[in-house]
From Swiss-Prot:
UniProt protein name: Polyribonucleotide nucleotidyltransferase
GO BP terms, alphabetized: mRNA catabolic process; RNA processing
Named cofactor requirement(s): Mg(2+)
Lineage: Bacteria, Thermotogati, Thermotogota, Thermotogae, Thermotogales
SUPFAM superfamilies according to UniProt: Eukaryotic type KH-domain (KH-domain type I) (SSF54791), Nucleic acid-binding proteins (SSF50249), Ribonuclease PH domain 2-like (SSF55666), Ribosomal protein S5 domain 2-like (SSF54211)
Gene: pnp
Compartments where located: Cytoplasm
UniProt keyword terms in alphabetical order: Cytoplasm, Magnesium, Metal-binding, Nucleotidyltransferase, RNA-binding, Transferase
Cited function: Involved in mRNA degradation. Catalyzes the phosphorolysis of single-stranded polyribonucleotides processively in the 3'- to 5'-direction.
Catalytic activity as recorded in UniProt: RNA(n+1) + phosphate = RNA(n) + a ribonucleoside 5'-diphosphate
Organism per entry: Thermotoga neapolitana (strain ATCC 49049 / DSM 4359 / NBRC 107923 / NS-E)
Length: 707
């Protein structure tokens, strides 16, 4: 067993190898502060045939014992990965995936298990460091060293590994990963920060990443691991030369420049099949399927080079646009009568339908994860059905990609929402992707913002998002605005920026090359800002402010405040009083027993108002001398029990009836109303009444005074 230690950012970073999980190809136990993770990396001996990608799976295992907790619910053990675990797995996957050899076809599984969790040192960020080491000490081919860090920005200062208070009171919460040379991955949110501050944050993050990478280099200098060879099947003799001689580059260029996505894909597929047939014929191969993998690879590379050359040399993109040109945009709101808010945002061949549903305060999402407990009142869910790309696939639960895209869009919008005190509704936004050709997560931000305003949610400003790309050659660099799927696939970087007219609210970047300079990143961010302003103008033209009224189908929520000491009176013995209010007025009621804040939800404004009036009446202090009207609930020889408010029952003694008791009892029965005056309240809060004479009691009638 070997152990290495180094102090970084005031915390001790400890790495152990050879102590646990020794049968794993690569395994390290990393402890940073009070957070400890075990990272393991293994590879299958078998090569998977017929695929054109690296078969990598990253799993992130949250163990509740790491935070000293037992899982909630009926089943007291961890089940399928939570959304937070899936997001953590994606966060680790993204910086390591580009560092595997492109031709590697053996299945790789990376597992990060959280053994101890410190809220101020995120386990997923430590996991990036641990996975990098586990892969490098394993036999798995891996070409680099990466590390990650979480950055906050508060009071003009950048903070590494910010506390929850720093995040809440600060302006930024981003996770950054990279190599010694450059930042390669960013994911996070901000409260309308400038492009300059974002670049400064990445620069600060990289200074810490370099120190973390340096520590890894020190550790790895003691290892000399033999990596397994990457098996690359040799093409038949003469195939490459034959293919290149048959390839008509002008014909390929014409097919790439077909504007519509489906037509372009069909044209390129047709030409690939033609080249496959011609190559097989030229090489006297009877079955073209024998050489299909080789031809497909050569063709893919030719398409990539041609598309990039068109952009760099001619400034023309596959759909005919210039590098900084945005596809045609259209916005619509108020599409459906029964939804609380709706919007359709279309950008070229990407289309998102945003739907807003307003719910009661009790509709919040309960959060009980490894490091978080509480409730979530704003949710954004992103759906990517197969028909949006014209494909046929089985419909299952949300994929990791759908969860990740929805999370990014949610972070982009959430800081524009009103506080709960101003708008007590639970808010759910659903984005249905109806068409997709690049940047559907940013289309979700736009449709979500439009739908929120259509629903009457008082968001402070519109938020728009744009996806940017980069083509980086030795002699040229071209930044692309509003990338399509093809440019995302063949480009060197894609980054998504969402924000208002005043700053960035969410940012995501993935770099396939060794990294980009601060100057180039700043240039790309400013180009993204121009695009964002253009989209925001279109959105403001469609709906410039939240609608003044909510949908008539949205629930009605009204809030009142009572004395916290009176909460028990409103609830009543065994909940009897509150249950009756809920049943009588067809409402939902939520009471905070610490603050006395009462929220009443219903579909009828009259019922909600009446319920609130009754709650206020119940919570109102009863004073000696006050005249009240109550209902007879019980008759005894010594007097009558009168309920003057729900749950508030007092005694009208026979001596206080004001006439002969036997004669009076002939005129009344249980359920009748009677007017009484409070003459005493004892130390236990028990009420004593005297009768206030009136002409005659109203049989069977109950008077509820409501204000």
């Amino acid at each position: 067993m070997k152990e290495w230690r180094r102090e970084i950012l005031g915390r001790e970073l400890v790495v152990q190898h050879g102590k646990v999980a020794k049968q794993s190809s690569g395994a390290v136990l990393v402890r940073f502060g009070d957070t400890a993770v075990l990272a393991t990396a293994n590879i299958s001996d078998k090569v998977i045939e017929g695929i054109d990608f690296v078969p990598l799976t990253v799993e992130f295992q949250e163990r509740f014992y790491a935070a000293g907790k037992i899982p909630g619910g009926f089943i007291k053990r961890e089940g399928k990965p939570s959304e937070s675990a899936i997001l953590s797995a994606r966060l680790i996957d993204r910086p390591i995936r580009p560092l595997f050899p492109k031709k590697l076809r053996n299945e790789i599984q990376v597992i990060v298990t959280v053994l101890s969790a410190d809220p101020n040192v995120p386990p997923d960020v430590v996991g990036i460091f641990a996975v990098s080491l586990a892969l490098n000490v394993s036999k798995i081919p891996f070409e680099g060293i990466v590390a990650g860090i979480r950055i906050g920005y508060r009071d003009g200062q950048f903070i590494a590994f910010p506390t929850e208070e720093d995040i809440e009171k600060g302006l930024m919460d981003i996770t950054v990963a990279g190599t010694k040379d450059a930042v390669t991955m960013v994911e996070g949110e901000a409260k309308e920060v400038s492009e300059e501050d974002m670049v400064k944050a990445l620069r600060f993050a990289h200074s810490v990443i370099k120190e973390l990478v340096d520590f890894q280099e020190e550790i790895l200098s003691e290892f000399n691991v033999e990596k397994i060879p990457v098996v690359e099947p040799e093409p038949p003799e003469g195939l490459v030369e034959t293919f290149n001689s048959l390839l008509d580059r002008e014909e390929l260029e014409r097919r790439i420049l077909v504007k519509a996505k489906k037509e372009r894909e069909a044209a390129l597929k047709e030409y690939e099949e033609k080249l496959l047939s011609q190559t097989a014929e030229a090489l006297s191969i009877v079955d073209p399927e024998e050489i299909k993998p080789f031809v497909s690879e050569l063709y893919e590379e030719a398409v990539k080079k041609t598309m990039r050359r068109l952009i760099v040399e001619k400034g023309i993109r596959a759909d005919g646009r210039k590098p900084n040109e945005i596809r045609p945009i259209s916005c619509e709101v108020g599409l459906f009568p029964r939804t609380h808010g709706s919007a359709l945002f279309t950008r070229g061949e990407t289309q998102s339908l945003g739907i807003v549903t307003l719910g009661a305060p009790m509709d919040v999402q309960i959060i009980d994860t490894l490091l978080e407990e509480g409730v979530k009142r704003f949710m954004l869910h992103y759906n990517f059905p197969p028909f949006c790309t014209g494909e046929v696939k089985p419909l299952r639960g949300p994929s990791r990609r759908e969860i990740g895209h929805g999370h990014l869009a949610e972070r982009a919008l959430k800081n524009m929402l009103p506080p709960e005190e101003e708008f007590p509704y639970t808010i759910r936004v659903v984005s249905e992707i109806l068409e997709s050709n690049g940047s559907s997560s940013m289309a979700t931000v736009c449709s979500g913002s439009l739908a929120l305003m259509d629903a009457g949610v008082p968001i402070r400003k519109h938020v728009a998002g744009i996806a940017m790309g980069l083509i980086l050659e030795e002699d040229a660099e071209v930044i692309l605005t509003d990338i399509i799927g093809m440019e995302d696939h063949y480009g060197d970087m894609d980054f998504k920026v969402a924000g208002t007219r005043d700053g960035i609210t969410a940012f995501q970047m993935d770099c396939k090359v060794s990294g980009v300079s601060d100057e180039l990143l700043m240039k790309a961010l400013m180009q993204a800002r121009e695009a964002r302003m253009y989209i925001l103008d279109k959105m403001y033209e469609t709906i410039s402010a939240p609608r003044p009224h909510l949908s008539r189908y949205a629930p009605i929520i009204k809030v009142t405040k009572i004395d916290p000491d009176k909460v028990a009176d409103v609830i009543g013995p065994g909940g009897r009083v509150i249950k009756k209010i809920i049943k009588d007025f067809d409402v939902k009621v939520e009471i905070d027993d610490e603050t006395g804040l009462v929220k009443v939800v219903g579909n009828s404004e009259e019922n909600v108002d009446n319920a609130i009036a009754l709650i206020r009446e119940i919570a109102k202090e009863i004073e000696v001398g006050e005249i009240l009207e109550g209902k007879i609930t019980r008759i005894e020889p010594y007097g009558l029990f009168i309920e003057v408010r729900p749950g508030k029952i007092g005694l009208l003694h026979q001596s206080k009836v004001g006439e002969d008791m036997r004669q009076f009892l002939k005129k009344v029965k249980v359920g009748d109303t009677i007017k009484v005056q409070v003459i005493n309240i004892d130390d236990l809060g028990r009420l004593q009444f005297k009768r206030v004479k009136e002409e005659s009691p109203q049989h069977g009638e109950v008077h509820n005074k409501r204000h």
